[in-house]
């Protein structure tokens, strides 16, 4: 603890007591914020882990399926299947405030880009059709995964900042204020006793 460099006066004592009350209120609010952020963060981490495992599993299986599907077609035909994008994806990113943390909210609009796309169920095979269907179903999960991962990163940063502020109040500001208040109270009591002794001597 470090005693603040202030004059031991009653006015200063009152000011320090007000500062201590404010610091203690701020400490409680920040602790509550930190705890709620942690609760939400843990929930998001669980969702993130679940989504990541799910997406990775789908991608691994899909790559295997694609290798099989590709082996059943000649290379030129496979190139033709992928030569023109069949869909256009517009990505929209909005902002949402969660406990003073600005996090992204993503959604998309998918439209057919070319009705006469090279990809055709006639020129393809059932294996390749399954690959396309799986990849299309994965888009929403990939978007949600990106959203959750970014939110986790931003919330982790805010938790760390809040933790530092809580610790600063708990281990530095509040103890220093308390120590200084105690010191001033002792000094004022000493002054009162000294004054009382002088009065008694005069009498």
UniProtKB/Swiss-Prot annotation:
It comes from the Bacteria. InterPro entries: V_ATPase_D. GO terms for molecular function: ATP binding; proton-transporting ATP synthase activity, rotational mechanism; proton-transporting ATPase activity, rotational mechanism. One of its GO terms (biological process) is proton motive force-driven plasma membrane ATP synthesis. It holds the Pfam family ATP-synt_D. Signal peptide: none annotated. The keyword Transport applies. Keywords: ATP synthesis, Hydrogen ion transport, Ion transport, Transport. The keyword Nucleotide-binding does not apply. Belongs to the V-ATPase D subunit family. Produces ATP from ADP in the presence of a proton gradient across the membrane. This is V-type ATP synthase subunit D. It comes from Streptococcus pneumoniae (strain CGSP14). The gene is atpD.
């Amino acid at each position: 603890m470090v005693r603040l460099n202030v004059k031991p006066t009653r006015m200063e004592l009152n000011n320090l007591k007000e500062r201590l009350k404010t610091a203690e209120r701020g400490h409680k609010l920040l602790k509550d914020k930190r705890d709620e952020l942690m609760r939400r963060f843990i929930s998001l981490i669980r969702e993130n882990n679940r989504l990541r495992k799910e997406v990775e599993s789908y991608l691994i299986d899909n790559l295997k399926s694609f290798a099989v599907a590709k082996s059943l077609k000649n290379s030129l035909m496979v190139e033709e299947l992928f030569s023109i994008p069949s869909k256009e994806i517009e990505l929209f990113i909005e902002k949402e405030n969660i406990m003073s943390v600005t996090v992204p909210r993503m959604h998309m609009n998918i439209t057919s880009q070319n009705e006469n796309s090279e990809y055709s169920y006639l020129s393809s095979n059932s294996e390749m059709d399954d690959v396309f269907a799986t990849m299309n179903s994965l888009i929403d999960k990939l978007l949600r995964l990106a959203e959750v991962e970014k939110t986790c990163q931003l919330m982790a940063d805010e938790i760390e900042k809040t933790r530092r502020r809580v610790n600063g109040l708990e281990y530095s500001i509040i103890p220093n204020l308390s120590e200084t208040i105690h010191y001033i109270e002792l000094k004022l009591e000493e002054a009162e006793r000294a004054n009382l002794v002088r009065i008694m001597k005069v009498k």
